[in-house]
Design a protein with these regions (language model features):
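Bacterial N-terminal signal peptides that target proteins for export
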Residues: 1-8
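Hydrophobic h-region of N-terminal signal peptides that target proteins for export
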Residues: 13-20
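Surface-exposed repetitive/solenoidal architectures
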Residues: 23-35, 49, 58-59, 64-67, ...
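Solvent-exposed, conformationally flexible loop/turn segments
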Residues: 39-52
Length: 472
């Protein structure tokens, strides 16, 4: 059936006779359908992993590539992962070693229609699938939705290849609407319609009347996804409308706790948000005084991604029920995103209100972005109203609340040497009441920083250019 199957089998046998003497093995690739195409094999030191950069990504018309497998059936337990479960700054914890010359088989996925709630729920059975929504669906009859795709605690520093239980497929909403998502109790601390997405895509989807109302610790929650991760340039949310969202959460601040609440995705590590619209409101009450970080924004919380041509209209209300420790707690809040790298041609409307108990919290609030990590914010505008009451340090910027020095050094390590805010506008004037240390900058909370030095040899410089400010 497969034109190159016999050839690969014969070649594999001949390679095996010499591999032991040479201490190398070869990985061959079978495209797993009737074709004359061929992919070059990869040579690997025997007993070592196949590096991530050696993984081929073939293309087949009408199908989506779904990974490499050790047998042509391409069952989940047969998946072969390249690289290792680590990033450039963490030690490897897991890998698949090539012990002998072998053949890997391509998995191909074709579009599958989704017409019922039951079919939507079943996509968790094939996380590489390509799904097309063909009807509007109402989820309000499900008291507590279980997210599709799971995040594991050791995912954070791993390539998306190793996010073994995340959604890695395509979900095309086809312009249809999913209404009435309900999350009333967390089954995982990364929650939404999807719990975790890794190198997957969500397109052309509308969501309305989502209700995320619960009490929990350490949540990363949003209507669409708890966490999105990409390494291949293909993780994306495009042309989606997530509107009428209500997020009401009471959470407790333990030592070193991270929380994230947004109208689209709790965190996004790489990938693209493009041509989307979000609206709604959130009410967050934070108990406990253990330190940590809080992220709140219309689109994304902890974010290192590209956001383009997105609009938001979100009311964000955050209350600290107890005083926070001095210098032990930070909150990053943005009308568009809590934190960001690259933002282009976006618009934010709405309101941000923060109230406390006169503690030592540090607040960084931006009309667009609470904390700009590294990159470029351009061509964007905010009219978000900001009000802060009874807190410690509160730094507000019309466009960005802060330029984060620590992440600026990290950006330099990635080769980004200039962080820029250009061609942006802010209309409004923040209100401070009983704030012990208020700071306001028309474009950035503390203005344009001095350049940063970097231990990697490349520093970070900052530039604010061609921005405009009006009080009303």
């Amino acid at each position: 059936m497969y034109s190159n199957r016999l050839f690969l089998s014969i070649l594999l046998c001949s390679v095996a006779l010499t591999a032991a003497a040479q201490h190398t093995s070869r990985v061959f690739f079978d495209l797993n359908y009737d074709t004359d195409q061929a992919l070059a094999p990869v040579t690997v030191t025997t007993g070592c992993m196949a590096p991530a950069e050696a993984k081929p990504y073939p293309v087949r018309e009408g199908y989506r590539f779904g990974g490499w497998y050790t047998a042509p059936e391409c069952r989940p337990e047969q998946e072969w992962r390249f690289g290792c479960n680590a990033s450039f700054y963490t030690q490897p914890t897991d890998s698949m070693c090539v012990e002998r010359s072998m053949i890997l088989y391509a998995k191909w996925v074709s579009p599958k229609p989704i017409r019922t709630v039951e079919e939507l729920d079943a996509i968790r059975e094939d996380l590489y699938g390509w799904y097309v929504l063909e009807n509007d669906l109402d989820l309000s009859g499900i008291a507590n939705w279980t997210p599709v795709g799971e995040y594991e605690g050791d995912y954070e520093f791993a390539p998306a290849e190793w996010w073994r239980h995340a959604f890695k497929g395509v979900f095309d909403g086809g312009g249809h609407t999913i209404r009435g998502l309900r999350i009333t109790e967390l089954t995982t601390d990364k929650s939404g319609l999807f719990g975790a997405i890794a190198d997957g895509e969500v397109l052309n989807l509308n969501m309305e009347d989502s209700r995320l109302v619960f009490t929990a610790e350490r949540p990363y929650v949003a209507p669409l996804a708890g966490i999105i991760k990409q390494d291949l340039g293909q993780a994306a949310v495009r042309n989606c409308r997530i509107t009428g969202t209500l997020i009401q959460v009471r959470t407790t601040n333990r030592e070193g706790t991270f929380h994230s609440f947004t109208g689209l995705c709790g965190g996004i590590w790489g990938g693209t948000l493009e041509d989307n619209t979000v609206s709604g409101r959130m009410e967050i009450e934070l108990a406990g005084s253990g330190g940590g970080e809080l992220y709140a924004g219309a689109y994304a919380g902890e974010a290192y991604n590209d956001t383009r041509r997105c609009t938001s209209d979100f009311d964000i209300d955050i209350r600290f029920a107890v005083p926070q420790p001095a210098d032990g707690f930070k909150a990053f809040i943005g009308g568009l995103q809590a934190s960001a790298t690259n933002v282009e041609d976006c618009t934010a409307r709405g309101r941000i209100r923060v109230s406390g108990e006169s503690g030592g919290e540090q607040l960084f609030i931006g009309g667009l972005v609470g904390s700009e990590r590294y990159g470029k914010v351009s061509g964007s505008a905010s009219t978000v109203k900001v009000e802060v009451r009874n807190t410690g340090f509160a730094q507000v910027g019309g466009i960005v609340g802060e330029f984060n020095a620590g992440y600026g050094v990290m950006g330099a390590a990635f080769g980004v040497t200039t962080t820029t805010v250009e061609g942006c506008s802010y209309t409004g004037k923040p209100v401070f009441r009983k704030v012990s240390r208020p700071v306001f900058g028309q474009f950035a909370g503390a203005g344009e920083p001095e350049p940063l030095a970097s231990p990697w040899g490349m520093g970070m410089s900052y530039k604010i250019d061609r921005c405009t400010y009006k009080t009303k």
